[in-house]
Amino acid sequence: MRAAIFLALLSLFPAGCVDIVGADIQQVVREQKHFSTTGKPEVVLSTFDGSIEIRPWDKPDVQVIVEKRGRDDAAISSIEVHAEQSGNRVVVDVKAEKHGDRGFHLTWNFGRSAKLIVSLPAESDVTAKSGDGSIDVERITGKVDLRSGDGSIRARELSGEVNASTGDGSMTLEGKFGALRVHSGDGSVRIHAAPGSTAASDWDISTGDGSITLEIPDGFGAELDAHTGDGRIHVNEIPLSNVTGEIRRNTVRGRLGSGGSAVRLRTGDGSITLRRS
């Protein structure tokens, strides 16, 4: 999709007026950051373009490896890593220096990227943001906030409060959730709520264009509010009471178990499936 946008933009300018930056990636340079922490760390990560991988380890410290990728030394050197620590709060922000000269200069980041490979304690609060890239997280207990401008999000064995959003990409989240807010601008969403998950506050799960699958454990209580603009709703082996609307049509409301906070499911174009985990 980005390539199509790029070509459309390029066609707007006459020959000789555009300086295009971007080529096949040829070099990779690694930069490592290490932070000593004494309690539960709060880790804030961001990269302008590139994937983010987050894994727990058995050390109390936080390690971030930045893989800078570019077509030559100049491209690599234009990638800047900003790192700071205040107590147990760790921030790593990777940015690409912008080019500018006479006339119109179009910079396209497929010539540069920065992947983050992160190791941290299993009990951590994590915020991760990629301007254009996938995010992959596993076995983290704490508050987790994941955001991608354009890329898939995968998370496994999480425990706690989770917020996740992507402008364009699929999402798969598995774990024991309390609070949950999930949105994809364009992509399917699958949520596997493990035993012990509770709607401690309202859950909001939505996609602009794609299917939603929510798997919940036995005994899960909430007020279901599901709607699809163009699709069907399937409720498989899940007892509902106080049902409003017709199951398999585009809107269903009802009580799950003993009720509780709201679980809202919304898709503009796609099916919604609710089943046991």
Predicted regions span which residues?
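Intrinsically disordered, low-complexity terminal regions
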Residues: M1-S277
